[in-house]
């Protein structure tokens, strides 16, 4: 992959952060002065790590803590697989493609276009595992279900407007007695329209075929990144499964301060509490497994033969923007600091996933928006800009040979 990008597509000037980021920053600054809080029934701190979702104790895990329930679920998946999804080699080994989708807001249009272009190239595999955070969490279930849902991704990421995601109320009122500057009712309705009973059933079917879908959220109470086993939720048969599935997607895309947190009912020792969850990007900008099961589990395949992993990461953002002088003002400086910190976090996540790949003998490939693509735009969700990013992603994927095979600064190896 050429990290310098293709020929110029537009004026490559790096703009300030989106309106959402501005709202979040303004809110954070004002809230530092201290305002009243809304009542809640939070989990006592000493019980936080023991909290589970009622009737579904095996659907999530804390990142960085191997979880026996999620590991057993993954181990069971190898016997459920269809040979048509993951053909066996002559020696009995199997290659497992994984897809990790990053956050990035409206820039998810790039990832949606890339997936569609990948399909048109004829080389898009069936993924064993799909993960997502933030906008990647909105994309992940559709990517998991495969090319049949490419058109849904295209529609969402080329026609959605800001008003389809959130609405602003009285900012002063929200700062004084609220918990966010915007109302995400429109986004919740959008998720509800696309993720219905039939959709959930298809997720469950793929889970029972040995494939796995994970979404990450940030638990603000526990200060931890949480990995949710979405296929297990879908396949649980519980009456609350559909609502829970939708809530996890919404939570992972709920930018703190700008958007309201999402509350999950949990229990400890028979008593009910609530947990406050926000955008998964707070905990990780992109993740593969979150350290919730043993790395060797794919190699071992439950004793069914050797497994090899092929890791694909789509960064729904521009990791290498061209320099752009910062205005000498408090908001401009603060916004640029947040922007730079976010990009640094992505680099760290790429190195972490790459390190896993090196240890496990897996292939590693990733893609980002080329640095000379113009990211200008005043509206947070602008169909014109998003259609342009969709087209960029589609063109790159359809052309093939677009992947980088090592993190920034590392020697690039030929793609397998």
Predicted features, each with a name:
Residues 1-19:
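N-terminal secretory signal peptides that target proteins for export/translocation
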Residues 19-26:
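Sec-dependent signal peptide recognition
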Residues 131-132, 136:
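Gly/Ala-rich beta-loop-alpha elbow adjacent to hydrolase catalytic centers
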Residues 31-34:
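C-terminal motif of bacterial Sec signal peptides marking the signal peptidase cleavage site
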Residues 36-129, 144-416:
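Patatin-like phospholipase
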């Amino acid at each position: 992959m050429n990290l310098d990008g293709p020929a110029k597509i537009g004026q490559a000037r790096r703009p300030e952060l989106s309106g959402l980021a501005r709202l979040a920053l303004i809110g954070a600054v004002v809230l530092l002065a201290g305002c009243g809080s809304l009542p809640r029934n939070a989990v006592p701190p000493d019980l936080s790590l023991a909290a589970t979702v009622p009737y579904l104790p095996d659907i999530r895990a804390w990142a960085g803590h191997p979880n026996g329930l999620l590991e057993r679920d993954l181990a069971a998946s190898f016997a459920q697989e269809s040979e048509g999804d993951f053909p066996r080699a002559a020696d009995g080994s199997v290659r497992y493609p994984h897809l990790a989708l990053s956050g990035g807001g409206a820039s998810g249009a790039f990832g949606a276009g890339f997936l569609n272009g990948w399909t048109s190239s004829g080389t898009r595999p069936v993924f064993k595992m799909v993960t997502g955070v933030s906008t990647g969490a909105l994309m992940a279930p559709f990517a998991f279900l495969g090319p049949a849902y490419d058109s849904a991704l295209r529609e969402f990421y080329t026609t959605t407007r800001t008003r389809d995601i959130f609405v602003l109320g009285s900012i002063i009122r929200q700062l004084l007695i609220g918990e966010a500057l915007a109302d995400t009712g429109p986004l919740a309705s959008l998720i509800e329209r696309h993720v219905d009973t039939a959709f959930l059933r298809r997720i469950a079917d793929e889970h029972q075929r040995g494939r796995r879908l994970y979404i990450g959220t940030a638990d603000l109470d526990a200060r931890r990144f949480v990995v949710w086993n979405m296929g297990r939720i879908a396949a649980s048969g519980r009456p609350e499964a559909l609502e829970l599935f939708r809530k996890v997607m919404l939570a992972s895309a709920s930018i703190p301060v700008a958007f309201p947190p999402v509350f999950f009912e949990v229990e400890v020792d028979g008593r009910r509490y609530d947990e406050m969850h926000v955008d998964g990007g707070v905990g990780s900008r992109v993740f593969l497994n979150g350290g919730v099961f043993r790395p060797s589990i794919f190699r071992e395949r439950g004793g069914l033969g050797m497994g090899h992993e092929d890791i694909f990461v789509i960064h729904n953002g521009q990791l290498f923007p061209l320099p752009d002088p910062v205005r000498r003002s408090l908001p401009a400086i603060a916004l640029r600091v947040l922007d730079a910190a976010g990009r640094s976090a992505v680099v760290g996540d790429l190195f972490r996933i790459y390190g896993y790949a090196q240890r496990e003998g897996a292939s590693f490939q990733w893609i980002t928006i080329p640095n000379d693509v113009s990211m200008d735009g005043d509206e947070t969700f602008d169909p014109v800009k998003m259609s342009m990013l969709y087209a960029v992603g589609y063109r790159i994927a359809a052309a093939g040979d677009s992947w980088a095979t090592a993190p920034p600064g590392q020697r690039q190896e030929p793609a397998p």
